[in-house]
From Swiss-Prot:
Similarity-based family: Belongs to the universal ribosomal protein uS17 family.
General function of this protein: One of the primary rRNA binding proteins, it binds specifically to the 5'-end of 16S ribosomal RNA.
Organism: Burkholderia thailandensis (strain ATCC 700388 / DSM 13276 / CCUG 48851 / CIP 106301 / E264)
Record protein name field: Small ribosomal subunit protein uS17
Biological process terms in GO annotation: translation
Record note on quaternary structure: Part of the 30S ribosomal subunit.
InterPro entries assigned to the protein according to its UniProt record, in alphabetical order: NA-bd_OB-fold, Ribosomal_uS17, Ribosomal_uS17_bact/chlr, Ribosomal_uS17_CS
Amino acid sequence: MNDSVKTSLKRTLVGKVVSNKMDKTVTVLVEHRVKHPIYGKYVVRSKKYHAHDEANTYNEGDLVEIQETRPVSKTKAWTVSRLVEAARVI
């Protein structure tokens, strides 16, 4: 009955890398839709997170998944867990 499958209790978010200019850090823009409480219209809300990128492998435009972790620095408490979709090169 008791399966030994472990699931992570850490929060995960999916967003787009908007900056990779810092060493071992990327800035990830996470957007989500929220219904306005009075008017009922869906509005796009966004927030930027600094995430740890140990190998400097992610580029601007990549769609990545970030996972909550212990604080790495003053502004970093997230780490990039995987690449969802690479940026298109035009």
